[in-house]
Amino acid sequence: MSAASILVGYTADEAGADALAVAGRVAAATGAGVEVVLVLPSEARNSSVPADAGYERFLRERSRSWLADASGRLGTDVATKLHLRYAESSAEGLIDAAHEFGAALIVVGTARGGILGRSRIGSVADALLHSSDVPVLLAPAGSEASSDEGVTRITAAVGTRPGADALLESAVRLARSASAPLRLLSLVPIDLPAGLDAELAALTSTVHAEDVLDEARRALPVDLDASVETADGSSIEGAVRALDWHPGEVVLVGSSRLAAPRRLFLGSTAAKMLRELPVPMIVVPRTTRT
């Protein structure tokens, strides 16, 4: 990630401040630059309304003021570029900008209304999580207050479904770039079909967890600081709450098997994790972009 940029989908509110804070942490840790993008509705979308030159000028000036404020929040230690874009939708504008800049990551904040430090998906994040071919990072509410923690650990939530290779590759790259340890987390014991006999489920869970972690560990570079851990709980939410989370940690999850190739699709397991995670989550496409 150090050779690429990080794109922030900026909004002039608390969610935008959270996105900037997390992007700044990741950029400082990896050496990446930050592209701050504010997307306004395109003229085509508002073609039924007569153009008001005065209002459009006011909106442009206000938007540039918001972008200048965003740059000030990031400080001088991070290379920052500011962009005002027009698009039919915010998600479309962010994805197009990410392609143009070669961004390795799109960072957006989450909607308010949930427990502080937890994430509730807003409309822009939801659209990105079901269409983007660029990894998307969701900054939990309250991230602005903990912006000086750096990147202290990378956790990759691995499973048995297709897409694990892309997830591991992304996790290893980020861990190396940030000089952070990597934790492999197995959610297999609680990611099994409903209706299984309890004893059989327990046995199957244990065997699968060991196999998944062994296979993932073998795929890691020998010189990488890595650990493995198995989630323990009767539900995804309970297991996530019981796990140890470091300040400055970042979690990576893969896309659902329903995702189109090279696209994101937030699966049910990741969605359940997201509701309880106190740290940022990156959702990785089934296959990464080259």
Predicted regions and their residues:
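Glycine-rich, Arg-bearing micro-motifs that act as flexible, cationic patches
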Residues: L105-A127, V151, V250-E276, T290
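General small-molecule cofactor/ligand-binding pocket signal
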Residues: E35-V37, K81-R85, L137, R183-L185, ...
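Structural beta-alpha unit
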Residues: M1-S2, A15, G72-I106, L220-V251, ...
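Intrinsically disordered, low-complexity Ser/Thr-rich linker and spacer segments
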Residues: S143-T152
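Short beta-strand elements of ligand-binding domains
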Residues: V107-T110, P135-G142, M281-P285
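Active-site phosphate/pyrophosphate- and oxyanion-stabilizing loops and adjacent acidic/basic residues
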Residues: G24, A68, G72, I95, ...
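A short acidic, glycine-rich active-site loop
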Residues: A53-S65, A201-D211
